[in-house]
Amino acid sequence: MRAADEIYLDYGPFGRVIPASSIESFAADGTVDDELAPFINAIPEERQPDFQRVLSTPLELLSSGIPEEVTDPFILSQWLYSPIGESVLARIGRLIQTEGRQNGQRAIRAAIILAAADPAGLSPINLIRHYPTGGIRLDLQQILALAKAAKTNLAITDQLISSATQLSEAAAVAAPILDYSTLPILAEFDQFNVVKQSLMLEDSQRNRIYPANLYMPENLSAIQGPIPVMILSHGYGDTKDNPEAVAAARKLAANGFVVAMPEHVGSNKTYQNDLLAGLAQESFEAMEFVNRPLDIRFLLDTLEQRNNTEFQGRLQLDRVGLIGHSFGGYTVLAAGGATVDIERLQRQCDLDADITPENVNVALLLECRLLELDESSIQQLTDGSLADERVELEFFPCHSLQTDYSQALRQTHVP
């Protein structure tokens, strides 16, 4: 098996070469030879042992928070061959190239999978050992520019957090002292016992079958007037049975709401597990960008059909609220009338564009899969036809997408 013999460090027209054996020796016992000395000496002396340890320590031993799946060679292979994995590797491969200055995408993938399968584990030094070309070429100019941009972004984030903290502390000082022990317990506000009803929805037009759960007050006749309806849309790789979401649904139902929770079968936990088990080629279907808001629409259509027979016509289906997190946040936005700026997305997803912290954002990589859709599907995403006029309220703590929706949100008047 071939391994990388040399590490090429390129910075514009300038370059240096470090023998891989020099890095091996340093990782093994701290030996610093003449070729490696200029680089090791640039690291503060007190940090050099940490650098040595990181080079030779498998990923799973560096942090106790690393899931086992991250270092499983089969699961890694499945993910790295998926559309999102390919996209990630293509971007990294521009920074870490082959000896012949080709994109290192395939070589990096091979090194990761082989290192993960090696008893020595997924460590930087083992990646070098399993890199399948004679040399690894690092584009330092791009790597340093990316690191600088990331550092700037972190500084801006820290500044925003600091400013928000100062404002919060100032408001707390100005506000009267609140004795929380005197406040009522939220659970005491619950007015109704809650029951759960399971549905199986079959949308023949889309050839799509998916389950949904309803949470509602046990005694609907005890509610006066129209019964408000909320729909909760789960996130990417999640499920309608998420305990936290179910708890929120039950809390709403205990206070007079009928809450519906659909299972988005093309982007749920089961679909993601199928990828890891080798039963699927992708972690979610690109058509989910269309199907998710249509799941909401068909669910509302189903509730309208059942309203007169099961709910005495009292469900307030002309003023529905939506709640969504992550991919569910996108679902809420689309069902409320927000559209996608395709031209901007194409620029952000361009693999030949300069690499920035923004275009290696995982959320953007998810969104880039939208460009796989056919023309008619993309048309639905850009013309607002996925909107449902029955939606009157949206709440999305966090949507999964990188795209700036400030322009798109002007397409909807939903608060």
In which residue ranges do the predicted regions lie?
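Short glycine-enriched nucleophile-adjacent loop
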Residues: 301-304, 329-343
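Cap/lid segment of the alpha/beta-hydrolase catalytic domain
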Residues: 237-246, 251, 263-291
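Mature extracellular/secreted ectodomains of secretory-pathway proteins
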Residues: 15, 27-178
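N-terminal cap/lid segment of alpha/beta-hydrolase-fold proteins
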Residues: 169-226
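Alpha/beta-hydrolase active-site loop
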Residues: 281-317, 344-365
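The feature captures the conserved acid-bearing segment of alpha/beta-hydrolase catalytic domains
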Residues: 366-415
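Short beta-strand element of the alpha/beta-hydrolase
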Residues: 224-235
